[in-house]
Design a protein with these regions (language model features):
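Short hydrophobic core segments
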Residues: 36-38, 222-234, 378
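Glycine-rich FAD pyrophosphate-binding loop
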Residues: 53-72
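Short beta-strand to alpha-helix junction loop
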Residues: 93-96, 124-130, 170-188, 307-312, ...
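Helical element adjacent to the flavin cofactor pocket in flavoenzyme catalytic cores
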Residues: 173-225
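Active-site substrate-recognition segment that forms the wall
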Residues: 46-50, 79, 111-114, 231-359, ...
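Dinucleotide-binding Rossmann-like beta1-alpha1 core, especially the glycine-rich loop
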Residues: 77-157, 281-282
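N-terminal Rossmann-like FAD-binding beta1-loop-alpha1 element of flavoenzymes
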Residues: 35-59
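C-terminal catalytic lobe of FAD-dependent flavoproteins
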Residues: 288, 305-428, 435-443, 452-453, ...
Length: 507
């Protein structure tokens, strides 16, 4: 592509995305909607994208300052094959369907996807029947290509695996993905197709009206013909306002460690251990960005906000991961984090997906394999809502979306042409990840308003120094692009301000 045409393409795309995201932030002032979606995680955004195929007025409400601020930002980043879920369950169905949909969805939305496959390790001959049970479950669920591997074949596939592993269940359809990239892509595509997004909007209560529902928020009352509950760990509280059968969600906190990219080749596949009652256990997996991810732990708690990491949790994580891959270089950990899984402890033992009350649809209790299931859940619920509203499909639905150009991955001639069209793409701001000013500006134009919003969109601050070098420059760029004082900028919205004032003014 010539420099002139490349420049035109970049400019045109930027204008389109800027317009779309401003629409997302401000929205047309409609207070009566056909559908209100509550929750801007990957499930809510998948529902929004699928529902935007129809001629409907749709609004997604998110209590944080951006999408992808809850469980969707802190999980294992893997596409489960579907062998673990109980046959006949909703978890099994939506897992397998979501896994089948994911690769083509990633192509449409320009998201990184790597079908690296997964291995479930068995360390004792006495546990082989449990491994066989996983194999049979997978076959019943319709998972393709499953087999049990042993000995030399296992070690050829995964050279660093523990010598104590006697066998493994091989699932070639397992994959890895970027959960941030997926969530943002779904949201952007939904916005391109007319969905409104209202951020910093907390739902306080929902009431029935003659025309549907009144959704009371901290920013006023919105009316809608239907409501879709995708509120993560808070989904039970919304459910219990409108449904006779009550749910209780008890979050499970999972801690993770992320290792430096130099260790990313220590695992070629996602490596599990045999699951327990608490979940699929601690895994070791490569990421689509080249790091090594270890986790999660599983600790039940009543607090729906507590996401701290603990010394005890990280110690148990290290010990458990070492059973799969001995001598992991934990000194190379560049960050640790935790996320909450929305585990239902009362009222259901499966995903709650469907029309739970007249006009009230939901995806509740979406724990693992929720990321994998999101595309299938979105398609299913969108169809139910559309049928309820007698909605007509659009003829001009936009099915594709372009990712922000990853400058460091472009061929040399394309990189040169991009820099010639916009010099900002030649200014490296984040040295660890080699992220340019042009990429950061594009992230802001697509909705980033905080350091974490930029970080998750383009990885500035995601590398070895975790923003120690680039954070001040990123803040300068955000301040310049949004016209906001640096003292008003936050790490992740709310009260997470990074600066308290100017040096000579603070006493």
């Amino acid at each position: 592509m010539c420099n002139e045409s490349l420049s035109h393409a970049v400019t045109a795309r930027s204008v389109r995305v800027v317009a779309a995201w401003l629409f997302l932030l401000e929205g047309e002032k409609i207070d009566m909607f056909d559908a209100i979606i509550i929750g801007g995680g990957v499930t809510g955004c998948a529902i929004a994208r699928e529902l935007s195929r129809y001629q409907l007025d749709i609004c997604l409400l998110e209590r944080e300052e951006d999408v992808c601020c809850g469980t969707s930002k802190a999980n294992s980043a893997i596409v489960h094959a579907g062998f673990d879920a109980k046959p006949g369950s909703k978890k099994a169905y939506f897992n397998v369907e979501g896994s089948r949909m994911m690769e083509s969805l990633c192509r449409e939305l320009d998201i990184s996807y790597d079908r690296c496959g997964s291995l479930v390790l068995c360390f004792d001959e006495a546990d082989l029947p449990q491994l066989e049970q996983q194999l049979q479950r997978g076959k019943e669920n319709g998972v393709d290509g499953l087999e049990i591997v042993r000995g030399e074949k296992l070690r050829e596939m995964e050279p660093c695996v523990s010598p104590n592993a006697v066998a493994a269940l091989w699932a070639p359809t397992g994959a890895i993905i970027c959960p941030f990239g997926l969530t943002y892509a779904l949201a952007e595509n939904a916005g391109d197709n007319g969905v409104q997004f209202r951020f910093d909007t907390c739902v306080e209560r929902i009431e029935r009206t003659e025309s549907g529902f009144a959704v009371h928020t901290n920013g006023g009352v919105l009316e809608s013909r239907t409501v879709i509950n995708a509120a993560g760990v808070y989904a039970d509280e919304l459910h219990n306002q409108l449904c006779e059968n009550k749910l209780r969600i008890t979050p499970r906190r999972g801690e993770y460690c992320l290792l430096d990219k130099k260790d990313g080749k220590l695992a070629r596949h996602t490596i599990f251990q045999l699951p327990s009652a608490l979940g699929k256990g601690v895994l070791v997996t490569p990421t689509v960005h080249g790091n090594l991810l270890v986790g999660p732990t599983a600790a039940a708690q009543d607090d729906k906000e507590f996401t701290a990491t603990t010394a005890a949790g990280l110690a148990s994580l290290t010990a458990a991961a070492g059973l799969s891959v001995p001598n992991l270089p934990m000194r190379d950990v560049i960050t640790s984090f935790s996320g909450l899984r929305a585990h239902i402890t009362e009222g259901a033992d499966d995903f709650v997906i469907g029309e739970s009350a007249e006009g009230f649809f939901e995806a509740a209790g979406i724990e693992s394999p929720g990321l994998t299931s999101a595309p299938a859940i979105g398609a299913y619920l969108a169809q139910l809502v559309a049928e309820k509203l007698n909605a007509v499909q659009k003829t001009d639905f936009i099915s594709t979306r372009r990712a922000i150009a990853p400058v460091k991955e472009l061929p040399f001639d394309e990189r040169c042409a991009l820099i010639e069209s916009d010099a900002a793409y030649g200014q490296v701001i984040c040295r660890c990840e080699q992220i340019t000013e042009g990429e950061i500006v594009e992230a802001i134009r697509r909705g980033a308003r905080s350091l974490d919003g930029v970080k998750r969109r383009v990885r500035a601050g995601m590398g070895r120094c975790q923003g120690g070098f680039c954070a001040p420059r990123v803040m300068e760029i955000i301040s310049r692009e949004l016209g906001v004082a640096q003292t008003d900028l936050t790490k992740s919205g709310g009260d997470s301000r990074l600066l308290v004032g100017h040096t000579k003014e603070v006493r």
